[in-house]
């Protein structure tokens, strides 16, 4: 009985660790993607501002 309960707990813990690792890798991708989008927005803004200055 103890061994069966112990295996069940270990199985739950390993499943949680697996899900946590999936969420972690997804978080890293999302963080990198949002950082990339912010950089693109800044570049676009600077191009618009500097482009207007050069045209004047």
From Swiss-Prot:
Subcellular location: Secreted
Single GO biological process annotation from the record: positive regulation of cytosolic calcium ion concentration
Gene: Adcyap1
GO molecular function (one): pituitary adenylate cyclase activating polypeptide activity
Modified residues (Leucine amide): 50
Important for receptor binding: region residues: 42-50
Name by which UniProt lists this protein: Pituitary adenylate cyclase-activating polypeptide
Alphabetical keyword list: Amidation, Hormone, Secreted
PANTHER family named among the record's database cross-references: GLUCAGON-FAMILY NEUROPEPTIDE, PITUITARY ADENYLATE CYCLASE-ACTIVATING POLYPEPTIDE
């Amino acid at each position: 009985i103890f061994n069966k309960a112990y295996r069940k707990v270990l199985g739950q813990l390993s499943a949680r660790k697996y899900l946590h690792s999936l969420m972690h890798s997804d978080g890293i991708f999302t963080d990198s993607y949002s950082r990339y989008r912010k950089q693109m927005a800044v570049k676009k803004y600077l191009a618009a501002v500097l482009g207007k200055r050069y045209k004047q």
